[in-house]
């Protein structure tokens, strides 16, 4: 159809070829049957052969990608938020957006009853709730901070690790931290308060022995390492930096404000606390659940020097 009129049609060429073969058969005295057989053999012998496909791996890959795309499109067609009727048929306590079935219409199809997809949906939701309880249930019941004064050893033994602990060490503990500060090699810059808190890269034996000559007096500290820093209050910058502490912290002098916050995953389930600390106060909080944040009041900012110890 698209070829020009001057180009001979393929059928015309084939007809001419058959006429030539037929005339050749007549010339050599062949019968009509022999001529037909001869023409058939010639046409079969000269039939064009298909070449093997090029790039077979590429072709197979393209077919696979197309098939996957079709399947995904089919899934997307059935994907949309559950209808109110469906949400009413499933218990509200078992619904969970993280379930792979929570936004798919499979739960409305007969196949859901055959393969118990509703049971899978409920199992997924319940397991997700159990994971939340495992991570944050330890702090959901914490309503206050346990304060210890004289009966340190007895109270600490009854203390659960998930409850923040305020230890009123008084002047003796404040003096020990101040002496550590005086013996340090760092230049003594003006400071509003001095803090001792935990890090994982510092040895703990010498620090704990200095602060607590009776090592069994506070067994909660035996697993923590420590460092000493001097902090001061300054005018607040446009974007004040937050100073966060993990584990435990001792105040040598000054009266900083400290907030105890649940870790990010537990902030919807656990409450936070605020403390005004005094010299000799020590705060302990499990770093897997809590973090401490220095929060000065007013238009001020906290800036801490590098570690002294």
From Swiss-Prot:
The keyword Transmembrane helix applies. Residues 81-309 are extracellular. Its main location: Golgi. The chain crosses the membrane at residues 60-80. It comes from the Eukaryota. It is a single-pass type II membrane protein. One of its GO terms (biological process) is epithelial cell proliferation. Keywords: Cytoplasm, Golgi apparatus, Membrane, Signal-anchor, Transmembrane, Transmembrane helix. One of its GO terms (cellular component) is cytoplasm. It is found in: Golgi apparatus membrane; Cytoplasm. Residues 1-59 are cytoplasmic. Homodimer. Exhibits histone deacetylase (HDAC) enhancer properties. May play a role in progression through the cell cycle. This is Bombesin receptor-activated protein C6orf89 homolog. It comes from Danio rerio. The lineage of its organism: Eukaryota, Metazoa, Chordata, Craniata, Vertebrata.
């Amino acid at each position: 159809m698209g070829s020009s009129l001057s180009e001979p049609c393929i059928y015309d060429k084939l007809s001419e070829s058959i006429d030539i073969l037929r005339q050749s058969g007549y010339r050599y005295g062949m019968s009509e049957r022999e001529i037909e057989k001869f023409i058939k053999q010639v046409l079969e012998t000269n039939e064009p052969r298909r070449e093997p496909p090029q790039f077979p791996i590429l072709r197979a890959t393209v077919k696979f990608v197309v098939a996957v795309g079709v399947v995904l499109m089919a899934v997307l067609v059935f994907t949309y938020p559950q209808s109110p009727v469906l949400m009413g048929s499933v218990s509200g306590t078992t619904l969970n957006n993280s379930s792979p079935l929570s936004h798919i219409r499979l739960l409305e199809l007969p196949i859901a009853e055959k393969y118990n997809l509703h049971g899978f949906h409920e199992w997924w939701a319940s397991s997700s709730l159990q994971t939340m309880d495992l991570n944050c249930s330890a702090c959901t019941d914490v309503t206050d901070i346990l304060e210890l004064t004289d009966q340190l050893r007895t109270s600490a033994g009854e203390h659960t690790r998930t409850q923040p602990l305020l230890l009123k060490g008084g002047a003796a503990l404040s003096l020990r931290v101040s002496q550590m500060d005086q013996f340090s090699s760092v230049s003594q810059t003006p400071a509003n308060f001095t803090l001792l808190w935990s890090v994982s890269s510092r040895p703990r034996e010498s620090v704990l022995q200095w602060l607590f000559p009776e090592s069994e007096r506070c067994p909660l500290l035996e697993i923590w390492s420590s460092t000493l820093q001097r902090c001061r209050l300054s005018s607040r910058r446009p974007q004040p930096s937050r100073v966060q502490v993990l584990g435990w912290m001792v105040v040598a002098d000054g009266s900083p404000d400290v907030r105890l916050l649940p870790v990010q995953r537990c902030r919807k389930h656990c409450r936070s606390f605020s403390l005004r600390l005094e010299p000799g106060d020590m705060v302990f909080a499990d770093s897997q659940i809590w973090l401490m944040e220095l929060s000065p009041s007013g238009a001020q900012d906290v800036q801490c020097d590098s570690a002294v110890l």
